[in-house]
C-alpha cells in the first residue's frame, strides 16, 4: 500500500510537475506571444528576462545590455511562441529581429545555450527544438538528433529568421514553421527558466551543475570573462562542443538536457569539437570566432571589432570568443556569457571554427571531426550563416583564397564576417583580413585558437587567394570562390556549392555535405537551406522563410544572412550577419548540432542577446529587408576580394560593404556577399569574374559585392558593374548581368551559373533578389541577358562584359547590365577603365564606389540594380534602393556633392564604399556605367517611373538613345528606369531619372545621369549617368563611355587618360591648348572663338547636361528627391553622357565623385567609350565642355563642365563656362552639385533655373560661364574679363571643390558672372542673333544630321578638335545616336549648346548646335540647339530657348536670361543665375518675355528670345518660338521645359521655372501667351519653337496655348501625329514641321477647354471651381491635384478665353495657376490618360511631375504642345500620362511627352522617329522637368 501511495504521490508529484511544466510552457508561450505583440518592450524586458531566466540569462545580461543582442536574446526567449511569434514578414526585418528576438527571450525562458548559440537569436529551447524542430521538422529528427548541429542549424535558421524575423525561434520557430510545435515543445522543454531547475535540472545545474563538460562550457559560456578564460579552456571546448551546446544554452543543463543526447554526441563532438574547436574551431573560431569577432567585425555588428559600438557585447564576445574552445563553448558559453553577443560571437567563432572545419570540414564535414567538422562544418557553415561572411567567407575566403571574396562576401558583408573569413576573408578583406587575421586572432580567438585558425585560416585566408584555407576549403573548391566556389562550384556541391546554388544551397550543400552526418542537418540545411536555401536564407531575410533560414541562412548563408542574416550577413549582414553569425554559430555549432537544443538555444540566445549585433543588422530593413539576394551575389564578392583591386571599388564598396555591412545598404548586400559569395562568390565566378576582374570579378565583386557587389568588390568591375548593378538589387540583377557572367556566365558565376541559370541566381539570388533575381533572373537573364551578353558570354561577365554587349545589351536588357557589361567590359578591358569594368569592378575599384550603385545602391544601388528595372527602384527605390540608397545612400547628393570626396567615398555609400567605386565603376564601365545605370537604372528603372523619367526611361529603355540609354541607361540611366538611382539605392537606381534622363537625354542624361548616378555613384547615375550621357542614347554610351572613362581618367588619371585625349583635342581646338589641367587654361583656351564655340558647346553641353539634369531632375522631379538619383541622374545622365569621359576622370559620372554631379564627366567618359554614347553628343558637350571639363575634371571637378563644372563638386570645373550650364545644372545638377550645393539648394535650383546650380557651381560655373563668355568672340573684352573671372573662379572653385565656399558666396559669384555673361551674351546674342547667331552652329541644322553629323559637324564647327578627339568621336557615334546632343554640342559648339541643345536636339532631334550663339549667350547655346532643330539659326535658339530644356534653359539661362532680362529677373533671381537677366526670376512670375522685344531688348538673347523674339528671325517661326522659347527658356528654371523657351510665351519658361517653382514664372507666361503673341502667329514660329521647344512646355498657353495645344487640330497633330509627324514635338523636326501644326495648335485659339496647371494639393478644389465659375458655367471641372492640373470646360470659347486670361498666372493659395487652352484632342488625351495615366505613365512621379509639370506647365496648350513637342508623343504616352493626366494641355503635353512622337523614342513614344529625338524629349523634358521637376524638386 505504502508503495502504492508512494507511487501515487510520486505520480501526483509528477503530474504536478508536469502541470507546472505545462503551465510554464503556456506562460512562456503567452509571454512569447505577448512579447511578440510588444516587441519593443519585449526587447529590453526580454533581455532582462533571459538574464534572470537563466544563469545564462544573467550572463547574457551584458548582451542584453547590448540592446540589439539583448533584443535578440529576448527573442530567443520568446522562442516558444515561435509559432505565434512567427513574425509576419511584414515586420521590418530590423524590427522584426529585434522584436522577435526580444520576444523569444522575453519568453522568459533563459535563452538556452542553443539560443546562445544562435546568438540569442534562436532561442535556447528551441535551439534544438525550434531549430532542430523546425529544421527537424523539416529536416527531421536527424537534426534534432544532432541537436547541436541541427539545432544550431535550425536555430541558425531560426536565428537568422529570428534575427530577421524573430524567427529565430522562429527559425526554430522559424521555424515555427511547421515545427513550431516541436520547437515549442522543445522550446518548452528547452526553454526553461534558469530557475526552473526542477524542470530542467540541467538548467538548474546549468551553471554549476551542468556537466563538467557543461560546466566548463557554462562557465566559459556563462561568463564572458570566463569565456575568455574558457577560451583558453579549449578543453572546455571539448566539452564545449557538447558543452557548446550546453554552454550555449543558457541553461547548460538545458542544453545538455536537450542536448542530452547530444551531449554524448556532444561529447564526442565535444572532443572533436574541442579539437575541432580548438583546432577547427579554434581555427574557425579564430577564424570564425575570432573572425567572428573580427568578422564579427565583418559582421560589423557582430564583432565588436567590427562594430564595437554597435555591438559592445560583441567586443566582449570577441574576447570571449577568444578561446577557440570557448568558441565552441562559446556557443553555449557565449550564450551565457555575453550571451547573445558573446555567444553569438563565439558562436560565430565556433562557427568560424566550424567554418574552419568547414573550410575544410565544411568543405567536407570533413575537417577533423566529422562531427566536429560537421559540427564545425556546420558551424562553419553556420558561421557562414551567421557570419556568412565568415562562413562563406571562411569557406570562401577560406576556401578561396578568395577569401577575399569570401571575405568579401561575408567580409564585405560583414566586416566581421570578413574578418570572419578572416583569414581568407580577412585577407581578402583587409579589415576582414585583419580581423581575420587579426580578427582571427582578433579576439581571443586569435590568440587562442586564433592562431590555429589563423594559421589555418589565415594561411588560406590570408592567403586568401591562396588556397590554404582555400585549399582546405578549396578542397572545397578552391575555386576561387573557392570556398564558395567550391561550394558553388558545386563543389562541394554541396557544400556551398549546393548552397551556393543559390547560395542557397550554399550552406546547404556545404552543409549538406559537411553535415554529412548531419544529414539532417544537411537536410535541414539542405532542406531548409535549399529551399530557403539561399533563397530561403535569403528568404529568411526575406521571409526568413524557415528555420531553414538558417539553412537558408546558411545557404544563403548568408542566406541566412540573407534572411536574417541575410542582410546582415550581407552587407548589413551585420545584423544578419551577426545573426547569421548567431545562426551561423548555431549553424555551426548547431551544425555541430550535437547538442541541438541547447545549442540552438544557446545560439539563439546568443544571437538574440548579442549586444554586438546591430539591430540594423538583424533587421532586414534596408537591405535585408529587401532581401535581395544580394547576398548571394554578394557572395561573389568574395572573389574580388582577393583582387585587391577589388578593393578598390570595393573598397568603396567593400567598405561600403563592409561598411555597409551594416549598413544595410549594399553593404548589406555585400554582406550578403556572403551570400553572394555563395552565389557569387562562389562563383565567384570568381573565376569568371575573376577573370574579369578579379575573379574576383565576381568574386571580387563579390567581395565587393559583398561589399556591394560592386562593391565592386572592389571594384570589381563587374561587380562594379554589377555591383553597381547590383548595386541595387537590381544592380544585382544587373550586376548579375554583368555577371551574367555571373549568371550566365558563369556561370561566370559558374555556380551562379546555376543561377545563372538565372535561375540560380535567380533563384537563389534572385529570388529575393528578384531584383537580382528577378532582375537577376531576369537580370540574370538580364544579366544573362543583359548580361546579355553576359549571359551570352558567359564569361559573360567578362565576356559580356567585355562585350559591349553588355553595354549594349546589357544595356539594353539591362541597361545596366548591358551597360555594365559593356561598360564593364570596356571598363574592364580598358582599364582605363578597368574601372570601367571596374567601373564596376574595375578601376573603380574605387569606382566601384563608383558603382555606387553598385555599391551602394547599387549595390544598393545595386542595386542591384539589377537591371532589372525591376526593382524599380532599385536604387533609389530600394533605396534607395538601396541606395540607395538605405545606407547612407546619399541621394546622390553626397556623392556628387563631394566630388572630391568622391573618391568614391562617398556618398552613396553606394558608394561610399565605392562611391568612387561605383562611379568609377560606372565609368569604368562605361557601359556598365550605363549599364549600371542601366542596370541600376534599369533596375532603377523600374523606379524609373520616376516621373518623366520613366517615360523616358522606358522608352528609352530601348533604344532610343534616350530610351535606351534611358532605359537602360536610364534605368540604367535612371531615368528610364528609374527611376532613377538608389539606390539606387543605386541607386540606383531611382535612377529612373537617371535613366530616362540619362538616357533620354543622352546628354542630359549623360549629364544628369552621371550626376545622377551620382554619377556615379551610386552608380545609379553612374550607371546611367555614367552611362548617362551617351548612354542616354545608348545607355551604354553613357554609361559606358562616360562612366568608364571618366573614371579612369577622371578618377584614375583623373585627367590623364581621358583628359589627355580631350586635352589634346581641346588643345588642338585651342580650347584646351594650354592645359588640360588648368581650368583656367582651358577656359582661356576657350576664349578663342573656337574655344568659344567649344565652350559654347561645353556650355551647352553643360547646360544641356545640366539642363538635362535639371530637366531630368525637374522633370522627374523624381529624382530630385534623391539627390543622388535625381541630381546625379539628372545631371549625370545627360552629363554623364555628355561628360562621360569626364566622368571617367571625375568619375563623376564615371566616378561619381567629382563628376557625378555632372554628367559631363561621363561625357568624356563616354567619349572614350566611344560611340556608345550616342548621347555623348553630349560629348559635344564633352567637346565643348570637355576642355573645360578637362580642366575641371582635372581640376578635380566633374567632368564636363556641366557636370564637373557646375557641379563638379570637387572641381572647380571651369567647365561651367556656360552659365547656363550651371544654370541648368543648377537646376538639376544641384543635386549633382550637391557637394557644393546643399540638397535644399538643389531643390531650389530647379526652380531657380540655373541660379543655384550655377552658383552652386559658382566658381565652377564661373569658370565655365566665363569660358562661355570668353567663347563669345564678339566680346573680346568680355572674353578677357571672363578669362580673369575664370582664373578667379578656378581658384574659387578649387576652394569650392573643397566645398569651402559657401553656396551663398558661390552663388553671388556666379550671379555676378552670370550677369556679366548675361550682358555679354545678350550683346553677343544680339550680334550673333542676327546673322551671327544664325551662323552659330545653326549648321547642325539637320536635327538629325546635326545629331548624327553633329559630332563631326558640330564638332567641326566649333569643336573640330573635339570631334577629332576620341571622346568626341565617341560622342560622335554617341552623338549620332544621340544625335541631338552631339549636334547640340557640336553645332553649338556643342559646348553650351550641347547640353541644352543636345538635349533638345536629342529630344527634338534638332541640331542644337545651331545655336552656338545662344550658347554663347547664357545658355544660349542651349536654346539654340533646341531651335537648331528647326534648322533656322534661331532654331537653335529655339531649341535652346525651347531648350526644350526649358530647365536647361535655366542653365542656358544665360542665353535665356539675357534675352529676358526681366523675366530672368523674376525667375532668374531665384536662380540667381547671373546669366539670366534679372528679370527672370524663378519664383517670380515672369513678366519679361512678353514685353521683350527681341529686337530692342538688350537682354534678349536668342535663347531668351526663344523664338528670337528679339531676333530678326523672330519672324522666323522658329525664331519666334525660339524667342518665346527663349523667354521661356529664360525661365530656365523651366529647364525642364525647353518649350517655354520654345514657346513664345515666356510664361512657358516661367511656367517651367515657376511651374517648378510654380507660377511665378507663369505670369509672364500669361502675357506671353497672350493668345496672339507668339500664339497663332508665331504659331508657326511657335510651332517651331514648340517643336523645338515643344518641350518648352508652353506651360502657359495662357493667352494662347502653345500652338497646337489649344488648337484641337494642332492638338491632334501634336497628339496624334502632327506633332508627331512633325514630330515637331515629337520629332525634333517635328517642331519645325509642326510649325504648321503649331500654327494650328499654336493657334492659341481658345478652346472650350482650359487646363490649369501648377495647382498644389493645398488648393481647395471647391474654391478653384468657384473661381473658374466666375468666368462662366463650367461644363466640366476635372481636378487632378495629384498632378497639379485641372481640366475645365466652358460653354463658350470666349468664356474659356476670359477664364484663361483671368486664371493664368493667377495666384491661388501658395501657387500660381497657369491656365492654358487645351484642344479637344488634348483634353481627350488628358482625360484618357490623365490621372491614371499620369501616374502610370512613366512614373507617377513623373506623371505627377510631368503632369504637374506639364500640367502645371502645360497647363494649357502651351504646355501641352510643348510637351507634345517634347514628349509630345511621348509626353502623352509617357508624359502624357503624366502630362496627359494634366489636362488638355497636359494632354497635349501628354501627347507631347507621351505618345507623341518625339521623344517617342525618348519618351516613350516612340515616335521614335528619332532616336535623336530622344534628345528632343530631353529638352522637352527639361522644360517640363523644370516645371515638373521643379515641382518635384
UniProtKB/Swiss-Prot annotation:
Checking CDD domains in the record gives: RRM_TNRC6B
Record's compositionally biased regions (Basic and acidic residues): 1-16, 24-41, 87-98, 638-651
Q: Phosphothreonine: which positions carry it?
A: 1449, 1464
Q: Residue ranges of region Disordered?
A: 1-98, 126-164, 205-350, 367-1046, 1193-1212, 1316-1346, 1590-1638, 1730-1763, 1809-1833
Asked whether the UniProt record includes RNA-binding among its keywords, one would answer yes
Q: Where is the RRM domain?
A: 1648-1720
Coiled-coil region: 1-39
Any one Pfam family here would be TNRC6-PABC_bdg
Q: Which domain of life is it from?
A: Eukaryota
Residue ranges, annotated region (Silencing domain): 1218-1723
**What SUPFAM superfamilies does this protein map onto?**
RNA-binding domain, RBD
Q: Which residues carry this modification: Phosphoserine?
A: 879, 1432, 1461, 1816, 1832
Renumbered residue ranges of the record's region Interaction with argonaute proteins: 1-994
Q: What is its main location?
A: cytoplasm
Q: Where is the composition biased (Gly residues)?
A: 772-787
Entry GO terms, CC: cytosol; nucleoplasm; P-body
Entry's localization field = Cytoplasm, P-body
The Gene Ontology biological process annotation of the record reads: miRNA-mediated gene silencing by inhibition of translation; miRNA-mediated post-transcriptional gene silencing; positive regulation of nuclear-transcribed mRNA catabolic process, deadenylation-dependent decay; positive regulation of nuclear-transcribed mRNA poly(A) tail shortening; regulatory ncRNA-mediated gene silencing
Spell out the subunit comment: Interacts with AGO1, AGO2, AGO3 and AGO4. Interacts with CNOT1; the interaction mediates the association with the CCR4-NOT complex. Interacts with PAN3; the interaction mediates the association with the PAN complex. Interacts with MOV10; the interaction is direct and RNA-dependent.
What job does the chain carry out? Answer: Plays a role in RNA-mediated gene silencing by both micro-RNAs (miRNAs) and short interfering RNAs (siRNAs). Required for miRNA-dependent translational repression and siRNA-dependent endonucleolytic cleavage of complementary mRNAs by argonaute family proteins. As scaffolding protein associates with argonaute proteins bound to partially complementary mRNAs and simultaneously can recruit CCR4-NOT and PAN deadenylase complexes.
- Which disease? Global developmental delay with speech and behavioral abnormalities: An autosomal dominant disorder manifesting in infancy or early childhood. It is characterized by mildly delayed fine and motor skills, mildly impaired intellectual development, speech and language delay, and variable behavioral abnormalities, mostly autism and attention deficit-hyperactivity disorder. Additional non-specific features include facial dysmorphism, myopia or strabismus, and skeletal defects.
Question: To which protein family does this belong?
Answer: Belongs to the GW182 family.
Protein name per UniProt: Trinucleotide repeat-containing gene 6B protein
Instruction: Give the organism the record lists.
Output: Homo sapiens (Human)
Amino acid at each position: 500500500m505504502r508503495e502504492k501511495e508512494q507511487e501515487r504521490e510520486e505520480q501526483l508529484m509528477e503530474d504536478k510537475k508536469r502541470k507546472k511544466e505545462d503551465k510554464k510552457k503556456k506562460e512562456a508561450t503567452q509571454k512569447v506571444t505577448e512579447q511578440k505583440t510588444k516587441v519593443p518592450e519585449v526587447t529590453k524586458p526580454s533581455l532582462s528576462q533571459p538574464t534572470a531566466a537563466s544563469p545564462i540569462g544573467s550572463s547574457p545580461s551584458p548582451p542584453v545590455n547590448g540592446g540589439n543582442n539583448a533584443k535578440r536574446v529576448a527573442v530567443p526567449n520568446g522562442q516558444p511562441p515561435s509559432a505565434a511569434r512567427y513574425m509576419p514578414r511584414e515586420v521590418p526585418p530590423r524590427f522584426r529581429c529585434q522584436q522577435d528576438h526580444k520576444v523569444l527571450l522575453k519568453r522568459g525562458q533563459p535563452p538556452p545555450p542553443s539560443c546562445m548559440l544562435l546568438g540569442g537569436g534562436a532561442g535556447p529551447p528551441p535551439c534544438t527544438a525550434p531549430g532542430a524542430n523546425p529544421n527537424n521538422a523539416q529536416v527531421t529528427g536527424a537534426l534534432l538528433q544532432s541537436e547541436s548541429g541541427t539545432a544550431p542549424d535550425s536555430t541558425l535558421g531560426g536565428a537568422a529568421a529570428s534575427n530577421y524575423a524573430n524567427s529565430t525561434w522562429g527559425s526554430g520557430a522559424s521555424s515555427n514553421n511547421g515545427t513550431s510545435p516541436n520547437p515549442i515543445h522543445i522550446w518548452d522543454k528547452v526553454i526553461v527558466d534558469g530557475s526552473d531547475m526542477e524542470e530542467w535540472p540541467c538548467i538548474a545545474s546549468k551553471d554549476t551543475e551542468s556537466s563538467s563538460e557543461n560546466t566548463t562550457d557554462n562557465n566559459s559560456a556563462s561568463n564572458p570573462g570566463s569565456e575568455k578564460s574558457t577560451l583558453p579552456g579549449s578543453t572546455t571546448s571539448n566539452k564545449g562542443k557538447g558543452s557548446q551546446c550546453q554552454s550555449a544554452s543558457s541553461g547548460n543543463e538545458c542544453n545538455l538536457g536537450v542536448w542530452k543526447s547530444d551531449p554524448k554526441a556532444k561529447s564526442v563532438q565535444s572532443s572533436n569539437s574541442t579539437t575541432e574547436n580548438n583546432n577547427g574551431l579554434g581555427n574557425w573560431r579564430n577564424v570564425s570566432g575570432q573572425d567572428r569577432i573580427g568578422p564579427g567585425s565583418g559582421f560589423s555588428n557582430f564583432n565588436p571589432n567590427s562594430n564595437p559600438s554597435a555591438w559592445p557585447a560583441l567586443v566582449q564576445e570577441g574576447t570571449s570568443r577568444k578561446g577557440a574552445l570557448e568558441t565552441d563553448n562559446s556557443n553555449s558559453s557565449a550564450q551565457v556569457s555575453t550571451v547573445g553577443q558573446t555567444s553569438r560571437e563565439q558562436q560565430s567563432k565556433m562557427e568560424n571554427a566550424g567554418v574552419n572545419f568547414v573550410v575544410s570540414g565544411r568543405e567536407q564535414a570533413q575537417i577533423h571531426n566529422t562531427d566536429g567538422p560537421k559540427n564545425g562544418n556546420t558551424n562553419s557553415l553556420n558561421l557562414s550563416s551567421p557570419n556568412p561572411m565568415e562562413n562563406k567567407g571562411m569557406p570562401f575566403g577560406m576556401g578561396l583564397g578568395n577569401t577575399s571574396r569570401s571575405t568579401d562576401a561575408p567580409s564585405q558583408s560583414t566586416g566581421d564576417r570578413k574578418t570572419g573569413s578572416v583569414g581568407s576573408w580577412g585577407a581578402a578583406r583587409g579589415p576582414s583580413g585583419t580581423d581575420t587575421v587579426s580578427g582571427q586572432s582578433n579576439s581571443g580567438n586569435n590568440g587562442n585558437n586564433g592562431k590555429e585558425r589563423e594559421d589555418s585560416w589565415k594561411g588560406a585566408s590570408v592567403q586568401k587567394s591562396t588556397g590554404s584555407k582555400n585549399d582546405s576549403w578549396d578542397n572545397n573548391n578552391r575555386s576561387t570562390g573557392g570556398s564558395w566556389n567550391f561550394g558553388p562550384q558545386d563543389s562541394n556541391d554541396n557544400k556551398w556549392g549546393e548552397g551556393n546554388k543559390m547560395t542557397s544551397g550554399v550552406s546547404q550543400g556545404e552543409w549538406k555535405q559537411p553535415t554529412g552526418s548531419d544529414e539532417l542537418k544537411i537536410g535541414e540545411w539542405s532542406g531548409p537551406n535549399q529551399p530557403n536555401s539561399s533563397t530561403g536564407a535569403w528568404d529568411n531575410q526575406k521571409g526568413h522563410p524557415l528555420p531553414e533560414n538558417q539553412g537558408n541562412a546558411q545557404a544563403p548563408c548568408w542566406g541566412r544572412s540573407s534572411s536574417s542574416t541575410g542582410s546582415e550577413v550581407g552587407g548589413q549582414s551585420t545584423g544578419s550577419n551577426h545573426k547569421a553569425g548567431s545562426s551561423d554559430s548555431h549553424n555551426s555549432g548547431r551544425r555541430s548540432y550535437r547538442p541541438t537544443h541547447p545549442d540552438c538555444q544557446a545560439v539563439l540566445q546568443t544571437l538574440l542577446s548579442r549586444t554586438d549585433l546591430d539591430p540594423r543588422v538583424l533587421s532586414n530593413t534596408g537591405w535585408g529587408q529587401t532581401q535581395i539576394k544580394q547576398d548571394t551575389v554578394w557572395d561573389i564578392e568574395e572573389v574580388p576580394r582577393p583582387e585587391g583591386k577589388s578593393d578598390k571599388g570595393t573598397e568603396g564598396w567593400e567598405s561600403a560593404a563592409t561598411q555597409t555591412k551594416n549598413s544595410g545598404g549594399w553593404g548589406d548586400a555585400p554582406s550578403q556577399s556572403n551570400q553572394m559569395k555563395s552565389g557569387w562568390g562562389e562563383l565567384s565566378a570568381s573565376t569568371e569574374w575573376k577573370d574579369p576582374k578579379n575573379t574576383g570579378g565576381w568574386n571580387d565583386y563579390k567581395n565587393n559585392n559583398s561589399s556591394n557587389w560592386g562593391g565592386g568588390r572592389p571594384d570589381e568591375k563587374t561587380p562594379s558593374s554589377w555591383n553597381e548593378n547590383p548595386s541595387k538589387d537590381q544592380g544585382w540583377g544587373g550586376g548579375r548581368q554583368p555577371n551574367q557572367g555571373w549568371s550566365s556566365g558563369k556561370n561566370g558565376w559558374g555556380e551562379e551559373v546555376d543561377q545563372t541559370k538565372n535561375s540560380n541566381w535567380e533563384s537563389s539570388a534572385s529570388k529575393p533578389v528578384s531584383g537580382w533575381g528577378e532582375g537577376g533572373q531576369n537580370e540574370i537573364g538580364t544579366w544573362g541577358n543583359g548580361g546579355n551578353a553576359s549571359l551570352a558570354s558567359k564569361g559573360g561577365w567578362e565576356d559580356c562584359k567585355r562585350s559591349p554587349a553588355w553595354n549594349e545589351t546589357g544595356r539594353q536588357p539591362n541597361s545596366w547590365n548591358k551597360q555594365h557589361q559593356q561598360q564593364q567590359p570596356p571598363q574592364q578591358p580598358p582599364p582605363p577603365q578597368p574601372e570601367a569594368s571596374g567601373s564596376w569592378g574595375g578601376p573603380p575599384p574605387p569606382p566601384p564606389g563608383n558603382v555606387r550603385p553598385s555599391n551602394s545602391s547599387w549595390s544598393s544601388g545595386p542595386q542591384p540594380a539589377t537591371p532589372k528595372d525591376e526593382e524599380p527602384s532599385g536604387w533609389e527605390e530600394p533605396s534607395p534602393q538601396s541606395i540607395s540608397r538605405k545606407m547612407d545612400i546619399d541621394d546622390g547628393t553626397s556623392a556628387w556633392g563631394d566630388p572630391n570626396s568622391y573618391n568614391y567615398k562617398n556618398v552613396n555609400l553606394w558608394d561610399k564604399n565605392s562611391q568612387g567605386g561605383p562611379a568609377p565603376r560606372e565609368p569604368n564601365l562605361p557601359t556598365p556605367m550605363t549599364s549600371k545605370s542601366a542596370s541600376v537604372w534599369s533596375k532603377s528603372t523600374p523606379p524609373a517611373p520616376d516621373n518623366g523619367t520613366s517615360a523616358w526611361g522606358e522608352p528609352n529603355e530601348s533604344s532610343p538613345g534616350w530610351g535606351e540609354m534611358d532605359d537602360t541607361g536610364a534605368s540604367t540611366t535612371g531615368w528610364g528606369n528609374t527611376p532613377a538611382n538608389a539606390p539606387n539605392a543605386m541607386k540606383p537606381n531611382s535612377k529612373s531619372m537617371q535613366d530616362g534622363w540619362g538616357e533620354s537625354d543622352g546628354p542630359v542624361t549623360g549629364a544628369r545621369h552621371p550626376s545622377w548616378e551620382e554619377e556615379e555613384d551610386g552608380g545609379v547615375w553612374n550607371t546611367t549617368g555614367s552611362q548617362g550621357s551617351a548612354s542616354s542614347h545608348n545607355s551604354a554610351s553613357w554609361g559606358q563611355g562616360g562612366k568608364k572613362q571618366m573614371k579612369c581618367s577622371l578618377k584614375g588619371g583623373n585627367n590623364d587618360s581621358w583628359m589627355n585625349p580631350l586635352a589634346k583635342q581641346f588643345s588642338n581646338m585651342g580650347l584646351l591648348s594650354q592645359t588640360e589641367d588648368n581650368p583656367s587654361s582651358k577656359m582661356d583656351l576657350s576664349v578663342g572663338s573656337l574655344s568659344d564655340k567649344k565652350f559654347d558647346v561645353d556650355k551647352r553641353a553643360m547646360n544641356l547636361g545640366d539642363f538635362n539634369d535639371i530637366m531630368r531632375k525637374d522633370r522627374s522631379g523624381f529624382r530630385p528627391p534623391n539627390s543622388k538619383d535625381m541630381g546625379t541622374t539628372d545631371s549625370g545622365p545627360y552629363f554623364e553622357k555628355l561628360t562621360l569621359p569626364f566622368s571617367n576622370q571625375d568619375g563623376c559620372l564615371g566616378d561619381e565623385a567629382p563628376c557625378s554631379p555632372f554628367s559631363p564627366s561621363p561625357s568624356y567618359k563616354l567619349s572614350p567609350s566611344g560611340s556608345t554614347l550616342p548621347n555623348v553628343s553630349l560629348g559635344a558637350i564633352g567637346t565643348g565642355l570637355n576642355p573645360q571639363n578637362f580642366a575641371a575634371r582635372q581640376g578635380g571637378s566633374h567632368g564636363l563642365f556641366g557636370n564637373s563644372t557646375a557641379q563638379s563638386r570637387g572641381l572647380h570645373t571651369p567647365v561651367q563656362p556656360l552659365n547656363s550650364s550651371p544654370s541648368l545644372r543648377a537646376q538639376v545638377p544641384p543635386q549633382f552639385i550637391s557637394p557644393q550645393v546643399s540638397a535644399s539648394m538643389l531643390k531650389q535650383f530647379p526652380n531657380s533655373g540655373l541660379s543655384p546650380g550655377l552658383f552652386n557651381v559658382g566658381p565652377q560655373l564661373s569658370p565655365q560661364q566665363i569660358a562661355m563668355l570668353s567663347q563669345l568672340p564678339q566680346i573680346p573684352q568680355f572674353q578677357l574679363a571672363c578669362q580673369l573671372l575664370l582664373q578667379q573662379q578656378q581658384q574659387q572653385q578649387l576652394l569650392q571643390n573643397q566645398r569651402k565656399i559657401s553656396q551663398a558666396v558661390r552663388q553671388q559669384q556666379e550671379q555676378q558672372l552670370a550677369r556679366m555673361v548675361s550682358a555679354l551674351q545678350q550683346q553677343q546674342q544680339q550680334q550673333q542673333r542676327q546673322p551671327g547667331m544664325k551662323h552659330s552652329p545653326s549648321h547642325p541644322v539637320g536635327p538629325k544630321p546635326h545629331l548624327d553629323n553633329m559630332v563631326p559637324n558640330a564638332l567641326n564647327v566649333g569643336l573640330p578638335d573635339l570631334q577629332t578627339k576620341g571622346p568626341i568621336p565617341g560622342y560622335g557615334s554617341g552623338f549620332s545616336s544621340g544625335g541631338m546632343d552631339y549636334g547640340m554640342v557640336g553645332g553649338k559648339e556643342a559646348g553650351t549648346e550641347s547640353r541644352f541643345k543636345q538635349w533638345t536636339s536629342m529630344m527634338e532631334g534638332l541640331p542644337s548646335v545651331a545655336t552656338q550663339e545662344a550658347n554663347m549667350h547664357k545658355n544660349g547655346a542651349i536654346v539654340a540647339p533646341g531651335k537648331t532643330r528647326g534648322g533656322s539659326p534661331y532654331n537653335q535658339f529655339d531649341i535652346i530657348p525651347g531648350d526644350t530644356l526649358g530647365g536647361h534653359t535655366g542653365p542656358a539661362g544665360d542665353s535665356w536670361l539675357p534675352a529676358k532680362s526681366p523675366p530672368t529677373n523674376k525667375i532668374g533671381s531665384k536662380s540667381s543665375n547671373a546669366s539670366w537677366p534679372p528679370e527672370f526670376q524663378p519664383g517670380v512670375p515672369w513678366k519679361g518675355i512678353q514685353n521683350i522685344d527681341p529686337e530692342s531688348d538688350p537682354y534678349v538673347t536668342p535663347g531668351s528670345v526663344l523664338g528670337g523674339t528679339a531676333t530678326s528671325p523672330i519672324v522666323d517661326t522658329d525664331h519666334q518660338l525660339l524667342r518665346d522659347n527663349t523667354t521661356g527658356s529664360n525661365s530656365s528654371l523651366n529647364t525642364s521645359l525647353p518649350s517655354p523657351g520654345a514657346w513664345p510665351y515666356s510664361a512657358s519658361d516661367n511656367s517651367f521655372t515657376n511651374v517648378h517653382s510654380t507660377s511665378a514664372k507663369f505670369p509672364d507666361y500669361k502675357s506671353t501667351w497672350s493668345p496672339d503673341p507668339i500664339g497663332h502667329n508665331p504659331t508657326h514660329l511657335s510651332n517651331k519653337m514648340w517643336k523645338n521647344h515643344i518641350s518648352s512646355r508652353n506651360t502657359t498657353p495662357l493667352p494662347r496655348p502653345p500652338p497646337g495645344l489649344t488648337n484641337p487640330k494642332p492638338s491632334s497633330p501634336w497628339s496624334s501625329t502632327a506633332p508627331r509627324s512633325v514630330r515637331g514635338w515629337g520629332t525634333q523636326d517635328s517642331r519645325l514641321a509642326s510649325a504648321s501644326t503649331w500654327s494650328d495648335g499654336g493657334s492659341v485659339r481658345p478652346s472650350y477647354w482650359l487646363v490649369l496647371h501648377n495647382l498644389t494639393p493645398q488648393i481647395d478644389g471647391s474654391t478653384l471651381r468657384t473661381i473658374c465659375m466666375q468666368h462662366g458655367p463650367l461644363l466640366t471641372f476635372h481636378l487632378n491635384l495629384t498632378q497639379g492640373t485641372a481640366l475645365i470646360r466652358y460653354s463658350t470659347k470666349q468664356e474659356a478665353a476670359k477664364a484663361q486670361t483671368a486664371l493664368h498666372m493667377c495666384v491661388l493659395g501658395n501657387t500660381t495657376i497657369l491656365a492654358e487652352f487645351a484642344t479637344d484632342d488634348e483634353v481627350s488625351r488628358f482625360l484618357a490618360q490623365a490621372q491614371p495615366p499620369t501616374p502610370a505613365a512613366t512614373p507617377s512621379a513623373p506623371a505627377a511631375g510631368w503632369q504637374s509639370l506639364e500640367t502645371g506647365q502645360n497647363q494649357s496648350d502651351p504646355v501641352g504642345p510643348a510637351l507634345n513637342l517634347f514628349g509630345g508623343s511621348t509626353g502623352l504616352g509617357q508624359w502624357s500620362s503624366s502630362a496627359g493626366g494634366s489636362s488638355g494641355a497636359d494632354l497635349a503635353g501628354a501627347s507631347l511627352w507621351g505618345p507623341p512622337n518625339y521623344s517617342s523614342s525618348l519618351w516613350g513614344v516612340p515616335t521614335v522617329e528619332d532616336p535623336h529625338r530622344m534628345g528632343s524629349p530631353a529638352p522637352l523634358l527639361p522644360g517640363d522637368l523644370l516645371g515638373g521637376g521643379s515641382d518635384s524638386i
